[in-house]
Amino acid sequence: MAAALLPTLSPPVSRAAAAFLLLLRAPAKPFSSLRPPQTLRRFLTSTSSSSPVTPPPALRPLSTVAASSSTTARAAPARRDLLMLGIETSCDDTAAAVVRGDGEILSQVVSSQADLLARYGGVAPKMAEEAHALVIDQVVQKALDDAKLSGSDLSAVAVTVGPGLSLCLRVGVHKARQVAKSFGLPIVGVHHMEAHALVSRLVNKDLDFPFLGLLISGGHNLLVLAHSLGQYVQLGTTIDDAIGEAYDKSARWLGLDMRKGGGPALEELALHGDPNAVNFRVPMRQHKDCNFSYAGLKTQVRLAIESKNLCTDDIPISSASEEDRQSRANIAASFQRVAVLHLEERCQRAVEWALKIEPSIEYFVVSGGVASNKYVRTRLNQIAENNGLQLVCPPPSLCTDNGVMIAWTGIEHFVAGRFEDPPAANEPDDMQYELRPRWPLGEEYSEGRSVARSLKTARVHPSLTSMIQGSLQK
């Protein structure tokens, strides 16, 4: 289907932290007393170069939410009475949820693209976008129906604005603006990786800042020190492939059923293998930092499969001989042991760095899709215990991409007064906004800077934390 021009996003900044809300190329400015500046810049797209400029409404603190255009102003509810709709479409899951301000989950709906993943051997952005567009209306409506609410009952809408796949992000953003415009609701733009970190605060009410976070998924490996809401230090990241990508590719090469997800399929197969059968090398041991690399380990897996003459492309594991199945299980178990050992070594160094910066840290938060892996949790729990920290992992349903984490992060920032006013009633559907597909969460720790040539830096937006710091300096 033809892709319509949908909103892209670029977050403004407040004095307390960056408001990842909707703006376009406007210089960030701090609040002045209780009256915020005009931080939202929008323009109407047109074939004409002389398109009229529409002045935006001001970003306002929570206590002074006002309406745009013909929408009706709403009084600020107490936190427990907040009702946040969260929408997530950053990659291959279409998700929506409604969460109350005190953390009660009223509904959670996820539509998976597992069949597409199996058919195309991974995420095909255009196919994923079309799949999102086909189900987004039903997913959001079911989230409202399951919560026994209508759009008019909501306090605000939170939506993932980055990082992620641009084609996919725009579907969720467009739907969020539709809902917000229809019911006069404020919008909170959410950083996908921050949402993975903060959902643990919904699960564990004792979890407070500062804490160490490990966010592991198909596209991300990220070690961060969370100082406070919106203030993060990046201790380490992946310089090529993330651990989830390595799990998925290895599972595919081993001929596993990808409909249940590559990670879970490989984890299950590894239970039947010898983790020491194949002598895979642990990546990056010569680099004394906290960065990750899984591209080389993927290559080792591929070579191991070829060396054993396993016909994994033609023979799925369900049709393989007993000897063949055992060889595949041994490769899976050996891969998992080394992949997680790489995690352990980097996390141990990150704990040491984090405690040097913030000696008061008590929690080690692990989230993201790979955090659902029981072997990963067991090994990282040992790291936490060895360093006197408490491991906090959300339940598996909140580790993978979901609407709950988006809604909860939206609540945290909405309460802090960081949101955009409802879209104007006359806002056209073909407006264009800047999305943030490459959006760092925090500033890099000086000791963690990598000199690896493959470190991805091109077309990266300024980090959320750098925007906060810039606003405070002004």
Where are these regions (language model features)?
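Acidic, glycine-enriched active-site microenvironments
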Residues: A2-K474
